[in-house]
Amino acid sequence: MALFITCRKEWLGSIWAKEKIGNLTNAASRRRIKYYFFYSTDELEMYRDVYESEPSCIVLLSNGGESERRLVSMFKELPMPLIVFGDHKYESISNEISYVMSDTADLTSRILDIFKKKGCKYPAVVGMVSTGQMDSLKIEQFKKMDYSGRGLVFDTESGKLSEAVEKLFKSSEPVDSIICSNDLQAICLIKIFDMVDPDWNKRLLLASYGNTTLVSQTSPSVTTGDFGFDSGSEQVIRIYRTLISGAGVSAMHTIMRHGFIERESTATQSPEGIVFSEKVTPKTETIKESVRRYKKAEKIEKILLGADAVDYRVIRGLMKGEKITDIADDAYCSPGTIKYRIKKYKETVGLAKTAEFSALLNELIDYKKIINH
């Protein structure tokens, strides 16, 4: 039994791909299913002996778009079932290809339900990429479901969050609740809102999609919808075992069991809202500097995704400025082991000095929240 996992190579660096791959390989390992990675038909050819000698399947990790359709057309002619481990609900579903999908419509609906119950009258979307497949779908869903009837969207065509933020600060429309594309965007917006109004979270509720590890440790922690990649991975395995069982099934289509986590970023009841055009607009460079937190946050999230108990002990120690020997004693490790881990962290985020890395941790993480790990 073997899975052959593929995706666009340029997508491998994203935290969403890392989470999907981690969940999928863990699910396969638990069932002693072998897995291989490939990125072209030539690379797959190297494993011909494997997929011709034992029941096998291709799993395409997808985030939508034209490139996905090209990959599907490339692989669906191969002598193996194809499962698309996607991110969203497909408009049309093939009877020849299996899909595991996220239902962003339900997540959007649940966010708006929470806003409505909290007494929010003026929801808006901020920062979504209008030209992106996933974000354009979320925007469309929001406009259909927005109970205020405004369908207020501050998006970006270029993919630059700063463009959307500048649109927001030009708006004379009141906003009392915001949905952004993902958690890391939310972390950037928190920084900008903090500069404009330290009490913004009493006037405005914030929610996003993704449920990253990092966003649960920020202040305030953002309310998020979890796409359910862990559930999706289990369903990929279930589909695979059904397809190879000889049950006469050519394809299966399932929806991931997502979750929703409400946090203090939606704790305020009946927020009064903010008219951003009445606020002092941060300078363009200030906005861009805040938005640069996205890349920093993404790199910290990569560390947290693979973190064990020792990693969390090291991170807490660095945030408090503890000596390496003290961290090592408390973690029951040698100082050399702790130094090696810190070296790997700095390589991940692209920093040379430990003090710089410690400062970054304190910038993004609330120490009071991370001590629970």
Per-range role (PLM):
Residues 27-28, 96-97, 104, 172-180, ...:
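Flexible loop/turn connectors
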Residues 89, 98-126, 160-166, 186, ...:
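Hydrophobic alpha-helical segments within soluble ligand-binding/sensing domains
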Residues 3-7, 54-63, 81-83, 124-128, ...:
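Periplasmic-binding protein-like
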